[in-house]
A protein has these predicted regions:
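Aromatic-lined carbohydrate-recognition surfaces of secreted/lumenal glycan-active proteins
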Residues: 9, 123-135, 200-204, 233-262, ...
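Substrate-binding cleft of secreted/luminal carbohydrate-active enzymes
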Residues: 38-45, 334-352, 378-392, 396-477
Length: 482
């Protein structure tokens, strides 16, 4: 791994639970050079009152925190904003600004984290989810929930449906209502925290947890944006529908071909060149992400944040090709990109994609279908894999190894770095929800990659044992604060 930041992501809830000095001293002690925090005022809630922590992610009940919040490894949190919204920033936005925290709750925790980081020589970053819809899950917003958000603002699939199962409830990036929401959120963050070193954007791309999500978005706003750019939308619709229909007519031979040569996510249906309009859709989604990032960069500049680095999280290869996260061209707009190696999601994705294909093709053999999906997504299983069938694939337990190989992790990082080329630095973004022994191996896999820096999500999953592992890995590394 090249020279770059060593960062830890945390939330204001962890500070409120353990104490500012306890958490920040622990971050500094492991050899971190940077931290990134959420901005909300997070307090204990009730079931049905905002969101579960850890996030449910549709079927993630097994996930628990390593570091309890107020004595609990799972709980419900209610979020508020630490500051009164500026009405001028929200003028013309279809969504109302989020409510400010009641006076009985501390509103200064985000500022304390930033100032405390600086006092310890750490670079201070914040994280913003510009396009996560209010009431929908996912993202770093105080308005997240377990609902679906405004359906009309969600990505529309080629079959005319909108997802009912949601991990990340973002709106369509070409929807003016959604873009206005993102600008208001980012401008509010810059208004109060314009002195930070950087702002990481989460979910400034499309999603693909479910196979069907790779066939979006076909809303009127996307059509208008495409046609304004001279793109043949009719061809995109026809070839995307052709690929969709082809995936409903799979044979065992198609699965065998994918297992032998899974060189893109839908290799079981043929080559991408067989569906040129779908390839055009992927290029259009990448252009949509770039336009959204450029819009946010301009927003930050006009809000007084010209000196603040804008950075972007994204899916790693091969998913990034479906989500629109074009690391090379995105890296010409943002100052850094972070491929997310959140590997607890990967068995869930493999299962969900497989279940969809089996629903569409009920005569296929489940194990062969799963192997084909794993091959297409470059998810080889380790020799020690204990899972024996589709039913075993889901959110891993806290002490359960993930069905991954370290070579695949390094390969995905190197592929993202290769895609980025000479644009902005590509930094590893690891998740610490996993057994401690595996965490050590994941760190080593990242350090053997060509990524330029490493971030760990999240303090709440870093047990004391994992903090010791992180300290051993990072204290001997070439460290910078960039």
């Amino acid at each position: 791994m090249g020279d770059g930041p060593r960062g830890i992501v945390l939330t204001t809830a962890e500070i409120a639970s353990e104490g500012l000095d306890v958490v920040l001293d622990a971050v500094a002690r492991v050899g971190a050079t940077a931290l990134s925090t959420s901005l909300g005022v997070l307090v204990q809630g009730r079931p049905g009152d905002r969101t579960r922590e850890p996030p449910l992610d549709v079927a993630g009940e097994a996930r628990l925190l390593d570091r309890p919040l107020w004595g609990q490894r799972e709980l419900y949190l209610k979020g508020y904003e630490p500051h009164e919204a500026d009405p001028a920033l929200w003028a013309g936005v279809a969504y109302p600004p989020p409510p400010i925290a009641p006076p009985e709750f501390r509103r200064d925790v985000p500022r304390q984290i930033i100032d405390g980081a600086r006092a310890r020589g750490l670079a201070a970053h914040i994280q913003v989810s510009p396009y996560t819809l209010p009431g929908a899950p996912g993202g770093q917003t105080t308005q997240s929930g377990h609902g679906g958000g405004v359906v009309a603002d969600r990505p529309l699939r080629i079959d005319g449906t909108v997802a009912k199962r949601i991990v990340a409830g973002h709106g369509c990036l070409n929807n003016p209502r959604v873009r206005a929401l993102g600008r208001a959120r980012l401008a509010e963050a810059a208004r109060w925290y314009g002195d930070v070193d950087g702002i990481f954007l989460d979910w400034a791309e499309y999603t693909c947890y479910f196979l069907e999500d790779a066939f979006a978005c076909f809303c009127p706003h996307c059509r208008a944006a495409a046609e304004a750019s001279g793109i043949d939308w009719t061809r995109i619709e026809a070839d995307t529908r052709a690929l969709w229909d082809r995936l409903h007519r799979l044979t065992p031979a198609d699965l065998d071909r994918a297992i032998a040569r899974g060189d893109w996510p839908f290799a079981m249906a043929g080559d991408l060149t067989d569906f040129p309009g779908y390839g055009e859709l992927l290029r259009f989604k990448a252009a949509s992400v770039r336009a959204a990032l450029a819009d946010l960069r301009a927003t930050l500049d006009s809000a007084g944040g010209a000196g603040v680095a804008l950075e972007a999280n994204g899916f790693p290869p091969p998913w990034c090709h479906l989500t629109g996260m074009d690391y090379r061209h995105a890296g010409q707009i943002v100052a850094a990109t972070r491929p997310k190696l959140f590997t607890f999601h990967w068995p869930m994705i493999a299962r969900w994609w497989t279940e969809t294909l089996l629903t569409w093709n009920p005569t296929l053999e489940p194990d062969a279908t799963l192997r084909a999906v794993q091959a297409c997504l470059d998810l080889p299983t380790p020799k020690s894999e204990h899972r024996r069938g589709l039913a075993d694939y889901g959110m891993p337990r806290p002490d359960e190894a993930h069905p991954i190989t370290m070579a695949a992790l390094t390969r995905k990082l190197d592929q993202a770095v290769g895609l980025a080329g000479d644009s902005a630095p590509c930094q590893a973004y690891l998740h610490s929800y996993r057994p401690a022994e595996e965490f050590a191996r994941v760190l080593a896999a990242a350090q053997s990659s060509t990524a330029r820096g490493c971030w760990v999500q999240r303090y709440g999953y870093l047990s004391d044992e994992k903090l010791d592992i992180l300290r051993a890995a990072w204290r001997g590394s070439n460290i910078s604060q960039s």
